[in-house]
């Protein structure tokens, strides 16, 4: 198991919270909660060691050219593909009311 932390510039925190995915399914679970204004914080707990660069690139692609809401995101991963990670994050953003 490996724990990774990332931070990105962000706007204002949303009012909502979201929990998407199921960690026990061999997939991943994503919890999105309002964060500190101006900061998006992501913590990833993953069963895949040595994947920090892959996670970093995934988040950089997702947030490039846009200002995400200020969130605290916790991801519990059990080997999900980058496409599934992005899908779960997009589902979470939709649930909290941010496009």
Curated annotation (Swiss-Prot):
TM region positions: none
Entry's family note: Belongs to the MdcC family.
Post-translational modification: Covalently binds the prosthetic group of malonate decarboxylase.
Primary location: cytoplasm
Statement: the UniProt record of this protein carries the keyword Cytoplasm: yes
Main function: Subunit of malonate decarboxylase, it is an acyl carrier protein to which acetyl and malonyl thioester residues are bound via a 2'-(5''-phosphoribosyl)-3'-dephospho-CoA prosthetic group and turn over during the catalytic mechanism.
Top-rank taxon, per record: Bacteria
Compartments where located: Cytoplasm
One GO term describing the cellular component: cytoplasm
GO function terms (MF aspect): acyl carrier activity
Protein's name in the database: Malonate decarboxylase acyl carrier protein
KW Cytoplasm (keyword) present: yes
Source species of the chain: Pseudomonas savastanoi pv. phaseolicola (strain 1448A / Race 6)
NCBIfam families registered for this protein in UniProt: malonate_delta (TIGR03130), PRK01220.1 (NF002293)
Keywords, alphabetical: Cytoplasm, Phosphoprotein
One Pfam family it belongs to: ACP
Modified residues (O-(phosphoribosyl dephospho-coenzyme A)serine): 25
